[in-house]
């Protein structure tokens, strides 16, 4: 199947190609998804470890059980994104948020 991911700000094609599924396509291209429009995407159980999601639009995306270890989510739009409570620490780290105690 053919897939494409567009840039969130300009609607230009960021990446296009073929894969068996959208999940597989995203995993194969996770190295540079900065400014990607992934709004409303079902990314549950997707391996996004080390993904560059800087300024990506992940609003309303399903990120439950996605592996976000060492991902860069800085300045990403996560409005109404769905995650599991067990992912909260990974998300905080990926957003580069420092918790002060």
Regions found by a protein language model. Give the residues of each.
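Periodic short-repeat tracts
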Residues: 35, 39-70, 75
């Amino acid at each position: 199947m053919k897939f494409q991911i567009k840039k969130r700000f300009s609607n230009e094609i960021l990446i296009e190609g073929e894969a068996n599924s959208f999940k597989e396509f995203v995993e194969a291209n996770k190295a540079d998804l900065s400014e990607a429009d992934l709004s409303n995407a079902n990314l549950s159980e997707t391996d996004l470890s080390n993904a560059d999601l800087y300024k990506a639009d992940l609003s309303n995306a399903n990120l439950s059980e996605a592996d976000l270890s060492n991902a860069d989510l800085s300045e990403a739009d996560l409005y109404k994104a769905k995650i599991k409570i067990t992912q909260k620490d990974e998300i905080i780290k990926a957003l580069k948020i420092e918790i002060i105690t």
